[in-house]
């Protein structure tokens, strides 16, 4: 899989990557390994995210994180859409995360929508997208509305309410996201809820942030509602941070009394001085039960201080055991708490929590409540922020006593000085009589922001549940989010991936992963849009759609994300590497590509999953485009594999939204649209196709390039003249034979690239970097050939044909003036 490493190569000042690995020999394992690291200075910014999944069960687990971002001195529009459909599958999991983001001196509009439907599955699991962002120096309004969902013919209905909130700019900015979920099954006695989260903004003027959520259940014994949450903060600059957590139970079980909960967390602080904000969560097992020993409790904690003076904000959590039950003694309570205030003038921040017991049941007397958390404000004027969450008991069950709750999470920090924000969550489920099931959630978050440096990291570890007697089931969700911002523009995004491993037909369970979003902006224009669509018709499908979008600072900016998946079932193997780069006043490049390969075995020929590759575009104050790919010397097989991926991208240009099982998506149209406006004589499709393969890129300063080539060529000739003279009096150019860096083929053949006869070959690292910078390359493998001509025939007559230096070059630019990625050809 070396070509994956190549596809993940990025162009910018620095790069960050970290592997996310999952085991392959466990019957049932659910991991969530989100990784996020973001730093921002006035010079450099790095942002990366990784996602990996391994699966070998009859169940499908999808993960579709989305990240989008923009900023500019002019109008910017950023849209992301993700759609996924499943046909003829017993169990289907869809994820429709969406995110988008903005900032600029003019109006910006961004919308996100997420919808999911399940038509053939008894039980449906969904995941809520998240949105969070920013603030400005003028008035900012942020509203969130939650969609209404009704269930008509099911004993129990599963709904969730989307979230919206956030905008920022020197003028008006609107950012919204919607999510709806419907459950059409009629045989499910189980309830799954997911609570979305929203957090955002502040300014020097009045800021209003509201969220409303309503849900109704029709013709159902019980109605499950979920109320979203909103939290915000503000400083003198732009700050946005949001994170969401959701977890849902697998389909109905015959003899399983199981309960799965997810911990919400909230922490936040802001002020002109240092602020420390931490929160921890602990879960205790409920008392012993007669029939089922199952109890899930969550005790989140929040503390925050902020102000030019001292501010102390604490929150306490109490948990009460549910009443005695006739058949099942099971109690699930979650009592989160949040409170916080900070500002030079008046700040009001309140949150209330109420818990109500569900109505009496004939068979099961069970009560499940979820109490949301929220609180936080900071600003030179007034800020009000509140969030509430309510959840009611699931209906009666004939054979299953089960209840699932999900609590959202939000955390944010910002200030002109140091800011630190930590949050941890840990939960262990008790032992069960008939089912040994354990659910752990260990999210971690840390964030700091200064006037110069910003570091944001998050790690998540998940442990495998113990062996099960009758059901091997384990569901974990670990959302995390943390973020910080400078006096200038800083964005932070993070994604979460979840993996499920197990033998086929052992688990009929579904695992979900929570996407996370954050965002950014720069002094120049950035447009980043990404689309993803999937279609499949197999019993099991695994997709990973990581997306990352960009940022820009006063200097170079690097932003990359990678996603890798591998699993050992008769399923398609996809690779979704993503890369994008953005630069500041001089260079801005943003690109991301997604390639995917389907297995060709006869038994799974019908299983072809395509991932709509992401689109990223560029636009800067100078005419420089930076290709995010650089070739490396590779063998024939590797080259063919790479070329296959490149061809797949190019073929997708004219196949958009076909809607068939082998779904093709236009990979580069969005980018190509913008080249027509900037370069009238440029063929966008041809340019992007070439740039994708790293063959040629336009040069911002051609005169400077030609001048340097002329000078370097003269210096190389002068150095050659000082070497051992040849018969014609000129220096004899070296011709290495079978060196470690040369092509290992007989008769001077090139396994990769084209054979060139170059008058000069630049090996000096300093000169190579200078030329590479002008060409738009950041990472080069091999040397650079100058004044080269193609060699028509290789082999025995090579010496007579090429009087200069024969090389194999993988990248050609500027009509042979400069050839990149050159390696010497051994002459026999």
From Swiss-Prot:
GO molecular function: structural constituent of cell wall
Keywords in alphabetical order: Cell wall, Cell wall biogenesis/degradation, Cleavage on pair of basic residues, Disulfide bond, Glycoprotein, Secreted, Signal
Signal sequence, start to end: 1-22
Modification comment: Hum3 is an atypical hydrophobin that consists in a repetitive repellent-like region that spans 578 aa which is separated from a hydrophobin-like domain by a spacer region containing three possible kex2 processing sites. The repetitive region contains 17 amphipathic repeats of 31-36 aa each of them with a C-terminal putative kex2 processing motif.
Pfam families: Hydrophobin (PF01185)
Residues with glycosylation annotation: 156, 222, 738, 811
Disulfide pairings: 750-808, 757-802, 758-788, 809-822
Chief location bin: secreted
Domain of life: Eukaryota
Subcellular localization: Secreted; Secreted, Cell wall
Family annotation (SMART domains): HYDRO
GO cellular component: fungal-type cell wall
InterPro entries: Hydrophobin
Mutant phenotype after disruption: Does not significantly affect surface hydrophobicity. Leads to complete loss of pathogenicity when rsp1 is also deleted.
Additional free-text comment from the UniProt record: Filamentous ascomycetes and basidiomycetes generally contain multiple hydrophobin genes. In contrast, hydrophobin genes are absent in the genomes of the yeasts Cryptococcus neoformans, Saccharomyces cerevisiae, Schizosaccharomyces pombe, Kluyveromyces lactis and Yarrowia lipolytica, and the dimorphic fungus Candida albicans. These organisms have probably lost their hydrophobin genes during evolution. Mycosarcoma maydis does have hydrophobin genes but the encoded proteins have been functionally replaced, at least partially, by the repellents.
Cited function: Aerial growth, conidiation, and dispersal of filamentous fungi in the environment rely upon a capability of their secreting small amphipathic proteins called hydrophobins (HPBs) with low sequence identity. Class I can self-assemble into an outermost layer of rodlet bundles on aerial cell surfaces, conferring cellular hydrophobicity that supports fungal growth, development and dispersal; whereas Class II form highly ordered films at water-air interfaces through intermolecular interactions but contribute nothing to the rodlet structure.
Subunit record text: Self-assembles to form functional amyloid fibrils called rodlets. Self-assembly into fibrillar rodlets occurs spontaneously at hydrophobic:hydrophilic interfaces and the rodlets further associate laterally to form amphipathic monolayers.
Family: In the C-terminal section; belongs to the fungal hydrophobin family.
Protein name per UniProt: Class I hydrophobin hum3
Organism: Mycosarcoma maydis
Gene behind this protein: him3
């Amino acid at each position: 899989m070396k070509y994956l490493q190549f596809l993940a190569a990025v162009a910018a000042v620095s790069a960050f990557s970290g592997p996310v690995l999952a085991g392959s020999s466990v019957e049932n394992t659910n991991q969530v390994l989100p990784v996020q690291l973001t730093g921002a200075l006035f010079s450099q910014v790095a942002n990366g995210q990784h996602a990996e999944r391994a699966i070998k069960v009859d169940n499908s687990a999808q993960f579709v994180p989305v990240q989008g971002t923009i900023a500019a001195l002019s109008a910017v529009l950023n849209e992301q859409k993700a759609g996924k459909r499943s046909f003829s599958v017993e169990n289907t999991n869809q994820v429709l995360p969406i995110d988008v983001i903005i900032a600029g001196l003019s109006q910006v509009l961004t919308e996100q929508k997420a919808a999911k439907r399940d038509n053939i599955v008894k039980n449906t699991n969904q995941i809520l997208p998240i949105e969070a962002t920013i603030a400005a120096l003028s008035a900012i309004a942020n509203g969130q509305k939650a969609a209404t969902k009704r269930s008509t013919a099911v004993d129990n209905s599963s709904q969730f309410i989307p979230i919206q909130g956030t905008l920022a700019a020197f003028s008006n900015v609107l950012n919204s996201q919607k999510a709806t979920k419907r459950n059409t099954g009629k045989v499910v006695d189980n309830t799954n809820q997911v609570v979305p989260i929203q957090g955002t903004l502040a300014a020097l003027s009045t800021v209003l942030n509201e969220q409303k959520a309503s849900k109704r259940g029709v013709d159902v014994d019980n109605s499950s509602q979920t109320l979203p949450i909103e939290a915000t903060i503000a400083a003198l600059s732009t700050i946005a941070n949001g994170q969401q957590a959701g977890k849902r139970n697998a389909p109905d079980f015959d003899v399983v009394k199981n309960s799965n909960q997810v911990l919400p967390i909230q922490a936040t602080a802001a002020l002109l001085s240092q602020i420390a904000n931490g929160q921890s969560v602990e879960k205790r097992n409920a008392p012993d039960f007669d029939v089922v020993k199952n109890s899930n409790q969550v005790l989140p904690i929040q503390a925050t201080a902020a102000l030019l003076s001292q501010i102390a904000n604490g929150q306490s959590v109490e948990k009460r055991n549910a009443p005695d039950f006739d058949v099942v003694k099971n109690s699930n309570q979650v009592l989160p708490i949040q409170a916080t205030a900070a500002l030079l003038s008046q700040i009001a921040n309140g949150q209330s929590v109420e818990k109500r017991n569900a109505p009496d049941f004939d068979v099961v007397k069970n009560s499940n409540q979820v109490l949301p958390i929220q609180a936080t404000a900071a600003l030179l004027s007034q800020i009000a922020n509140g969030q509430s969450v309510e959840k009611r008991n699931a209906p009666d069950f004939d054979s299953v006593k089960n209840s699932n709750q999900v609590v959202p999470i939000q955390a944010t920090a910002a200030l002109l000085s140091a800011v630190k924000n930590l949050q941890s969550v840990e939960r262990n489920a008790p032992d069960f009589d008939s089912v040994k099931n354990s659910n752990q959630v260990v999210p971690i978050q840390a964030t700091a922001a200064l006037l110069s440096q910003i570091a944001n990291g998050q790690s998540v570890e998940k442990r495998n549940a113990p062996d099960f007697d009758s059901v091997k089931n384990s569901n974990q969700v670990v959302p995390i989010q943390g973020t910080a911002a400078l006096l200038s523009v800083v964005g932070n995004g993070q994604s979460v991936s979840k993996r499920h491993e197990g033998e086929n037909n052992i688990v009929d369970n579904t695992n979900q992963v929570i996407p996370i979003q954050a965002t950014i902006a720069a002094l120049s224009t950035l447009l980043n849009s990404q689309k993803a669509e999937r279609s499949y018709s197999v019993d099991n499908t695994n997709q990973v759609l990581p997306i990352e979008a960009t940022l820009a600072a006063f200097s170079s900016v690097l932003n990359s994300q990678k996603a890798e998946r591998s699993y050992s079932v008769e399923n398609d193997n996809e690779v979704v590497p993503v890369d994008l780069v953005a630069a500041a006043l001089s260079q801005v490049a943003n690109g991301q590509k997604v390639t995917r390969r389907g297995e060709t075995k006869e038994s799974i020929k019908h299983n072809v999953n395509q991932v709509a590759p992401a689109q990223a575009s560029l636009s800067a104050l100078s005419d420089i485009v930076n290709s995010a790919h650089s070739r490396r010397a590779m063998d024939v097989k590797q080259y063919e594999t790479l070329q296959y991926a490149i061809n797949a991208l190019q073929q997708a240009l004219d196949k958009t939204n076909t809607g068939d099982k082998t779904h093709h998506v236009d990979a580069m149209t969005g980018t190509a649209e913008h080249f027509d406006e900037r370069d009238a004589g440029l063929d966008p499709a041809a340019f992007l196709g070439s740039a994708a393969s790293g063959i040629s890129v336009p040069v911002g300063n051609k005169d400077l390039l030609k001048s340097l080539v002329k000078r370097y060529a003269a210096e190389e000739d002068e150095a050659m003249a000082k070497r051992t003279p040849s018969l014609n009096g000129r220096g004899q150019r070296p011709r290495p034979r079978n060196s470690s860096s040369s092509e290992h083929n007989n008769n001077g053949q090139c396994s990769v690239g084209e054979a060139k006869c170059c008058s000069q070959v630049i090996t000096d690292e300093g000169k190579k970097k200078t030329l590479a910078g002008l060409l738009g390359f950041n990472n080069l493998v091999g040397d650079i050939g100058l004044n080269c001509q193609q060699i028509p025939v290789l082999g025995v007559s090579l010496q007579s044909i090429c009087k200069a230096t024969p090389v194999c070059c993988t990248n050609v630019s500027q009509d042979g003036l400069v050839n990149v990625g050159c390696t010497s050809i051994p002459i026999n």
